[in-house]
Amino acid sequence: GFAFGAFYYTLLGRQWMAALGKTEAELSRGNKATPFIVAAVAQIVLAFVLAGAIGHLGPGQVTARNGVISGAILWAGIVMTTMAVNHRFQGSKWSLTLIDGAHWLGVLVLQGFVIGLIGV
């Protein structure tokens, strides 16, 4: 998931900064390591939670296909709904919600695929 995020935001970095309303100089201030540490820990927690959800499908149901489907369902029902509410109250642009939301869809689908391949 972390490598996907690096690739994704490298491609969409300019659009993401515009949607965020910040410049590269503004983003480079402060502790640069903290967001990456938080992201890494959060993605580990996310993977464990996703593995638990996939594992609850029952014996013989932990497959790459079911992992992808579970990741997409959890993204639609939890991640995007929460992000949409938070972004609206924060006054964020819809483009930021779409860019960040698509990132998390990619993360959950990839994690679900890998979890489905290796099992829980």
Regions found by a protein language model. Give the residues of each.
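Juxtamembrane/disordered regions of integral membrane proteins
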Residues: 1-120
